[in-house]
């Protein structure tokens, strides 16, 4: 197992690879996608930010407003491998922004203890692939703390941030999408933003949420997603999906970095085939917005759900089951899932593994002609 200086060298190489390929999973030229920005009411002054800067700004505001908020994790003191915590230690001091040992189980356990004692811990797991050593602490301790104490104690102020998903040359251990593991756990909330505006608003809502939250950040979007972000304090409600694009022929559902892939597929379907697609960004995986999805599917009668995680047991299966229960008589075609393969995440074959816009476009065509 890599530890200490060796793992720092590996992470440094991965980050440099990430910078060279960001915006295009195959490493080829990036095609800009005009992704619709979310409008925030009474937004006030705005500033151009990419996704990691919006997350940094969100944590900054949380720490300004809450003197009990602390940020910690591997290498967060110097800004983290993706720079999400840059400048926070200088501003708030080493007692509130600090490094931890390379021990994810310890990070999670320490965060649970802090939350139980009234602090507001914002813990970082450096890559979502390494959240598994902390799995027991998260699902058996954090998620059940309030329940098993009969409501006497809780660690609801806990937020665990972690970058997830494909990025280009990440390989087996820096590319995974583990959201469905945690979506299966009562007592946790699971949030995945797709834009800078949403990242900041959802993160602030997560930090102030009364249940523990796992906040997965699409590392592909850290620098490639750029918007005019309100610099003030605002929240986006958890558990509420966003209809990115309205349509009448087919419902397309995704989250995180997959949203830009889906928008590209939707645009292709409309330009080449005249298909009107309704595109939904779940934003919160647990609890997910059942009513928004059901209302859309009853209108369109056709559904494609896409995520990077393997198909079997992925969150698309849970959504599909609910749609089948709630919308059976409205369906005009079988529900389609466009997902990663049921294999470990490959290195050189990443381009073929990920559910790109072409795979989603073909699935839309297949569903429409059924």
UniProtKB/Swiss-Prot annotation:
One of its GO terms (cellular component) is branched-chain alpha-ketoacid dehydrogenase complex. Keywords: Metal-binding, Mitochondrion, Oxidoreductase, Potassium, Transit peptide. GO terms for molecular function: 3-methyl-2-oxobutanoate dehydrogenase (2-methylpropanoyl-transferring) activity; metal ion binding. It catalyses: N(6)-[(R)-lipoyl]-L-lysyl-[protein] + 3-methyl-2-oxobutanoate + H(+) = N(6)-[(R)-S(8)-2-methylpropanoyldihydrolipoyl]-L-lysyl-[protein] + CO2. Thiamine diphosphate binds at residue 130. Its EC number is 1.2.4.4. Pfam families: Transket_pyr (PF02779), Transketolase_C (PF02780). Disulfide bonds: none annotated. Residues 1-25 form a transit peptide. It comes from the Eukaryota. Gene3D superfamilies: 3.40.50.920, 3.40.50.970. K(+) binds at residues 156, 158-159, 209. GO terms for biological process: branched-chain amino acid catabolic process; response to nutrient. InterPro entries: THDP-binding, Transketo_C/PFOR_II, Transketolase-like_Pyr-bd, Transketolase_C. Its cofactor is thiamine diphosphate. The keyword Endoplasmic reticulum does not apply. It is found in: Mitochondrion matrix. The branched-chain alpha-keto dehydrogenase complex catalyzes the overall conversion of alpha-keto acids to acyl-CoA and CO(2). It contains multiple copies of three enzymatic components: branched-chain alpha-keto acid decarboxylase (E1), lipoamide acyltransferase (E2) and lipoamide dehydrogenase (E3). Heterotetramer of 2 alpha and 2 beta chains. This is 2-oxoisovalerate dehydrogenase subunit beta, mitochondrial. It comes from Dictyostelium discoideum.
